[in-house]
Amino acid sequence: LFHCHVWVVDCICAIFYNIGSRMDPNLKQRIIEEAYRLFITKGMKQTSFCDVAVAVHKSKGAVIHYFPSKKKLIDAVVRMRFFPDSQISCEMYSLADKDWNEFLRQYRNPIERVINSFPKHLNGNLLVCYMQFVSSAHEYMDEFPQMYQQLLVREQDFLSNVAYDHKISLKDAKAFSRQALNTSIGKTFLRMFSEI
């Protein structure tokens, strides 16, 4: 009798879950968005499936349906939010070709681009949040350091190409790109220390 009762409850839960998930075709993306916000504000270690479920107004089972483990959820957040937010926008690519001075004025390094994509209502030192996110992603994802290194290499290559296209000698272009990236990252960290 007990097994029958459990089976009935499981069936009822499955029916309500399927009805609920049909009503929200964007649930997987919402889970990723809310998990990202929670990972930034609370930290990856401190964020539970229950926290994410509450944030998306669904059951823990609904979250686990899409992401059976915390590692898979973190992987999705890093690949679908963090790294896309780190990329150079199409507008910056075209601006580099059109208006060099404006490009130099508007250029933001990958750290600043990610921080600028954070939800607007976050409080506190966002650079510290960024650093904690990166540190935790490094712990949870074996391939994260390589992915992050590739991001920085692409960034420096982009800056080298932009500098070369603007008739800076190849040696100077490499030096410029390295200096531009290092300087902008350095400025980001200096701002962090001035906020402490």
Residue ranges and their predicted role:
Residues 1-26:
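N-terminal intrinsically disordered/low-complexity leader segments
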Residues 30, 34, 38-77:
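Helix-turn-helix
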Residues 30, 34-41, 88, 129-133, ...:
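Solvent-exposed, amphipathic alpha-helical segments
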Residues 45-46, 167-172:
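Short, charged helix-capping/linker segments at alpha-helix termini
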Residues 76, 90-122, 170, 174-180:
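Hydrophobic alpha-helical connector segments
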Residues 79-86:
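Short, basic, alpha-helical segments at the C-terminal edge of helix-turn-helix-like DNA-binding modules
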Residues 105, 120, 125-128, 137-167, ...:
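Amphipathic alpha-helical packing segments from all-alpha helical-bundle domains
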Residues 113-117, 132-143, 157, 161, ...:
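Amphipathic C-terminal alpha-helical segment
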